[in-house]
Regions:
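N-terminal catalytic cores of NTP/NDP-binding nucleotidyl/phosphoryl-transfer enzymes
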Residues: 1-35
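Short secondary-structure boundary segments
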Residues: 35, 74, 94-96
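A short acidic, helix-capping loop that chelates divalent metal ions and anchors anionic groups
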Residues: 39-45
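Short glycine-enriched, charge-decorated loop/helix-capping segments at active-site entrances
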Residues: 45-51
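Short hydrophobic/charged patches on amphipathic alpha-helices used for structural packing
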Residues: 58, 79-80
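Short acidic amphipathic segments
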Residues: 58-73
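Proline-aspartate-enriched helix->loop->beta-strand connector
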Residues: 83, 87-93
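Conserved small/polar residues in nucleotide/adenosyl-binding loops
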Residues: 98-105
């Protein structure tokens, strides 16, 4: 099974997000989306953010047909651990596409 990973804050979900997720899902069999915790979004984007809390953002993404699983992370170490555990074939972030650095079993 080819797993695809995408992550971001996904606050104020818009057409660009949806197009990205649709494209990401087309690359494999399962799309896992990581979202920044409220604390992480506030730290990077400032007070008043996120507009939608992490539970709502998770719910919105889980409601999309392109998304198979959503996880919330708070630190770069948590993000790294999650990506290492699922070993995605591709990582899609914004307009960037990364391939796995080594063959998967």
């Amino acid at each position: 099974m080819d797993i695809i990973w995408s992550n971001g804050c996904y606050d104020i979900l818009h057409r660009g997000h949806l197009e990205l997720l649709k494209y990401a899902r087309s690359l494999g069999d399962k799309l896992v989306v990581g979202i920044d915790s409220d604390k992480k979004v506030r730290k990077s984007k400032g007070e008043g953010r996120p507009v939608n809390n992490q539970d709502d953002r998770k719910f919105f993404l889980e409601s999309l047909i392109y998304v198979d699983e959503v996880v919330i992370f708070n630190t770069p170490k948590e993000l790294e651990g999650r990506v290492e555990s699922i070993r995605p074939k591709f990582i899609v972030i914004g307009c960037l596409l990364y391939t796995s650095p080594s063959p998967r079993d």
